[in-house]
């Protein structure tokens, strides 16, 4: 604890992250599991990115967004897992106040970007299926870049808002965070000043950040579903479901865990459920995304096989 300059309060200089397990016997198991998950996630997402870059058939708007999503997945898991692995190796569970805020900022930057990028991908599928004749014009490279740039701008604003709001809170008592990374709900519980305004801000911004994209995604897929029902060929159905089904699975996983995590701030203590949701948000989702998108997509599968076998595309 260190005294705050110009005040009579004391401020927490560092937090203690309790992590996923407290028993020393389980820590090597957790280390191995998370190291494996991290390497699989990095390898899977970089493979998807490489396939998109080298395969001419994948130089399409849908895969441009998928490549961006792969970069986000790598960033999301890198914000939390390497630091946790380092603490397990060094047997030190502390994180400085500044490092905690930095982790909070980058986590919400990437999570916010995920929200908007998934929305852009839904819009892309809407245009491809409902407006096929004008799709290339409506989803030009300029439009793609504008959508990604706007997503980054909105995500940055969201992350900065929460980080600045968090920096106004005072921490002068307990400093044990019942989690394996710094996040809003757990830090709210440790603050010795009122968090009512911060929680209200989280609900308001969360409604905009999650609610608006979710409404746009549902609207897009309502039109897509109506268009798919008019398709008479079995091949057309298969193609629509192969692209839309993967995206819908990722949307359900991402928004489902996110809403559960941030829309239940009334509980007095952080529980193991919060840690489980945190593992899903930061580890499981980024690890599953490459598998989900490649499992139902023969073009991605073919490109990945050619990369692994060292063959060039015939197109």
UniProtKB/Swiss-Prot annotation:
Query: Mind telling me which PANTHER family this protein's record contains?
Result: OLFACTORY RECEPTOR
Where, per UniProt, does this protein localize? Cell membrane
Membrane topology, record value: Multi-pass membrane protein
**Transmembrane among the record's keywords?**
yes
Keyword Transit peptide found: no
- GO CC annotation terms, alphabetical: plasma membrane
What is the designated name of this protein?
Answer: Olfactory receptor 3A2
> Per the record, what ranges lie on the membrane's Cytoplasmic side?
53-60, 124-143, 224-240, 296-315
Q: Per UniProt, what is the name of the gene that codes for the protein in this document?
A: OR3A2
Cysteine pairs bridged by disulfides in the record: 100-192
Source organism superkingdom: Eukaryota
Give the chief site where it resides: membrane
Q: Please give the InterPro entries that the UniProt record associates with this protein.
A: GPCR_Rhodpsn, GPCR_Rhodpsn_7TM, Olfact_rcpt
Q: What GO biological process terms are annotated to this protein in UniProt?
A: signal transduction
Q: Give the family from UniProt.
A: Belongs to the G-protein coupled receptor 1 family.
């Amino acid at each position: 604890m260190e005294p705050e300059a110009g005040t009579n309060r004391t401020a927490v200089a560092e937090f203690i992250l309790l992590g996923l397990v407290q028993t020393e016997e389980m820590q090597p198991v957790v280390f191995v599991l998370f190291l494996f998950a991290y390497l699989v996630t990095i390898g899977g997402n970089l493979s998807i990115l490489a396939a998109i870059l080298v395969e001419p058939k994948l130089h399409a708007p849908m895969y441009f967004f998928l490549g961006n999503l792969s970069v986000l997945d790598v960033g999301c898991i890198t914000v939390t897992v390497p630091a946790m692995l380092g603490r397990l190796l060094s047997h030190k569970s502390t994180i400085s106040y500044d490092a905690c805020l930095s982790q909070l900022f980058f986590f919400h930057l990437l999570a916010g970007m995920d929200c908007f990028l998934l929305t852009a991908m839904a819009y892309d599928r809407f245009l491809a299926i409902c407006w096929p004749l004008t799709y290339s014009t409506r989803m030009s490279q300029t439009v793609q870049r504008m959508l990604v740039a706007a997503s980054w701008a909105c995500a940055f604003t969201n992350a900065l808002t929460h980080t600045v709001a968090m920096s106004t809170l005072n921490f002068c008592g307990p400093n044990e965070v019942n989690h394996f990374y710094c996040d809003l709900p757990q830090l709210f519980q440790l603050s010795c000043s009122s968090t009512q305004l911060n929680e209200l801000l989280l609900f308001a911004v969360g409604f905009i950040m999650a609610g608006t994209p979710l409404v746009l995604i549902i609207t897009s897929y309502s039109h897509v579903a109506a268009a798919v029902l008019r398709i008479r060929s079995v091949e057309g159905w298969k193609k629509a479901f192969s692209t839309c089904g993967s995206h819908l699975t990722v949307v359900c996983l991402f928004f489902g865990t996110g809403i559960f995590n941030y829309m239940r701030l009334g509980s007095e203590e952080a529980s193991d459920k919060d840690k489980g949701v945190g593992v899903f948000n930061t580890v499981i989702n980024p690890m599953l995304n490459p598998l989900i998108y490649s499992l139902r997509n023969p073009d991605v599968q073919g490109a990945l096989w050619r990369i692994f076998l060292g063959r060039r595309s015939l197109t």
